[in-house]
Curated annotation (Swiss-Prot):
This is Uncharacterized membrane protein YndJ. GO terms for cellular component: plasma membrane. Its main location: membrane. It is found in: Cell membrane. It is a multi-pass membrane protein. Pfam families: YndJ (PF14158). The lineage of its organism: Bacteria, Bacillati, Bacillota, Bacilli, Bacillales. Keywords: Cell membrane, Membrane, Transmembrane, Transmembrane helix.
Length: 546
């Protein structure tokens, strides 16, 4: 990194000396990002992937950066546009690296997606820089507009998503608001570009939405708990200045829409360019380097099932994945002690709860499904689809009904997890309610229940953390306020894995010597939509379907 700093400083001094006294402020701004801000984000992005191909690309990008940056300077000093092609190709490889990370990552956390999208947008900046240096004619745009577009993609389109991602690594509250803000920030550069090209009205709308997102982003910055006073001051200063400069962008866009000159382009270069560089980007870079925000999943060892469903799941789905050695399991968990952590001591649970999870086949189950009022119209449609798919088939009938269950071994090599077993539950009509693939694992000293539900050409995985509460068992996917831990509900496809806006909690309680009750709550976007009550009875010979 020190080498990059020295090379960048020498290149920038050389550019200023060669161009003086007629130095283009816009050219200086784009070089400022190329020479200082691009290498400045390397610690936030690189050295964070276990994928060998990504690590190989990281090393190449770090080693090749000084050469690519040098050719970018040459392109402006010599006016040989071909030199800018080197920088463009370098940014393209950064984008390919980001796409590889997105493709290979196990969990598509919204904050990490935001960081990587910044690298993808940088490739757009590389293209517009090449277009300017090579004097390409693009639509009706003049050279200055092309250069300013390159500046835009080397600044806000590139760096704001990265800073937003770093904020996502830090905040513990308002996660839903953060997700919406992030998607606006990620999509706004495209909407603004379309507006500038095709529609002044769209441009005003896009800038307005982007401005609202930036102001809400500032709210999160000013309510976030940072580690250091210096980092807090610099990051909040950056956010405050950004609120001012984005307001000037709104004024400029509105003037273009009304065909009235409110601010000239030269004024915008100083306000939106120079001030952003030294009042927004530089403080944020220094502040985030001090904070050193790490990804939530940096130390996670979570694994996901490699088994995906077909068009129909049902009980027959298990034919291809049943264990080759016909392994037999009597419970969902071999030993509840494998889930032990500082928050969970199995010996503090009622013995009957331990018995149920370790000897599940010795219990009969009845269930009662209650959909929240607001969700009932959707539940009717959902029931129709779930019956045909044969998975997560929950009735709209509010009455109690019996569940017939059995446990079968699953081929662990095909699944990718250890000691996997399927818990199959059917109703009195012989319709499959659930086919759930159970496993347990440990990560960072904590045990988790890993439950995979095969879906058509995908799977949904619930990673549940256990807690003891008096003699009751709590299993939940809801993330802790500290954002530590692996718990959550995830959708996995061959394209990758992403968290879902779902959460669930089970509360299991022993009410008699041979009877348990369980309550299963589910939330969508934090709003409860489902409650399932279970009555679980221990008998020596459970009822089987005849």
């Amino acid at each position: 990194m020190k080498r990059n700093g020295i090379v960048s400083a020498l290149c920038f001094i050389g550019f200023l000396a060669a161009e003086a006294p007629d130095i283009s402020v816009a050219e200086a701004l784009v070089l400022l990002s190329i020479l200082f801000f691009v290498p400045g984000i390397f610690p936030f992005v690189f050295r964070q992937s276990p994928v060998r191909a990504a690590q190989f690309m990281e090393n190449g990008l770090i080693q090749c950066y000084p050469v690519a940056a040098f050719f970018a300077v040459l392109a402006l000093v010599t006016e040989v546009g071909g030199f800018a092609l080197i920088w463009w190709m370098y940014t393209v490889f950064n984008a390919l690296y980001a796409i590889l990370r997105l493709w290979e990552t196990k969990i598509h956390r919204i904050e990490e997606t935001s960081v990587l999208f910044g690298l993808i947008y940088l490739a757009g900046g590389g293209f517009w820089f090449f277009a300017y240096a090579a004097h390409l004619q693009i639509m009706q745009f003049g050279p200055l507009i092309i250069l300013l577009t390159a500046v835009h993609f080397h600044y806000s389109a590139f760096l704001i998503p990265i800073f937003n991602g770093l904020l996502g690594r830090t905040i513990r509250k308002h996660r839903m608001l953060y997700s919406w803000i992030t998607w606006v920030i990620l999509l706004s550069p495209l909407l603004i570009a379309l507006g500038i090209t095709y529609s002044k009205t769209l441009d005003v709308i896009a800038v307005s939405i982007y401005m609202a997102a930036i102001y809400l982003h500032a709210f999160l910055v000013f309510t976030a708990a940072f580690r250091t006073k210096t980092g807090t001051f610099l990051i909040r200063l950056s956010s405050a200045v950004l609120m001012i400069t984005i307001a000037f962008s709104m004024i400029y866009s509105f003037g273009v829409f009304r065909q009235e000159v409110t601010l000239t382009i030269n004024q915008m270069i100083w306000i939106h360019g120079f001030v952003n560089a030294f009042g927004v980007i530089l403080p944020a870079l220094i502040g985030w380097r001090i904070e050193d925000a790490k990804p939530f999943d940096a130390d996670s060892v979570k694994t996901f099932s490699r088994i995906y469903g077909k068009r129909k799941i049902g009980e027959e789905f298990l034919a291809n994945i049943q264990a080759e050695n016909n392994a037999r399991y009597s419970g969902l968990v071999d030993d509840m002690g494998s889930l032990r952590s500082k928050d969970f001591s199995p010996e503090k649970l009622a013995p009957l709860i331990l018995s149920f999870y370790e000897q599940t086949i010795e219990y009969n189950i009845k269930a009662k499904v209650t959909w929240s009022t607001w969700f009932r119209p959707l539940a009717i449609i959902y029931e129709w689809f779930s019956r045909r798919i044969g998975q997560i088939h929950l009735s709209t009938n509010p009455d109690w009904y019996r569940m017939y269950s059995k446990i079968k071994g699953v081929h662990s090599k095909k699944d990718g997890r250890e000691r996997v077993r399927a818990w199959i539950r059917t109703n009195e009509k012989n319709e499959t309610i659930f086919t759930a693939l159970y496993s347990v694992y440990r990560s960072n000293g904590e045990g988790y229940m890993n439950i995979s539900l095969p879906l058509p050409f995908s799977s949904m995985t619930g990673i549940l953390k256990p807690y003891h509460h008096q003699e009751k068992l709590v299993l939940t996917s809801r993330r802790r306020k500290s954002r530590a831990g692996d718990e959550g509900i995830y959708l996995q496809t061959r394209a990758g894995t992403c968290p879902l806006p779902l959460s669930e909690t089970f509360l299991i309680e022993a009410v008699h010597d041979n009877k348990l009750t369980a309550v299963h709550h589910m939330w969508l976007f934090g709003i409860k939509f489902l409650t399932v009550h279970y009555s679980i009875t221990h008998i020596n010979q459970p009822i089987e379907r005849t």
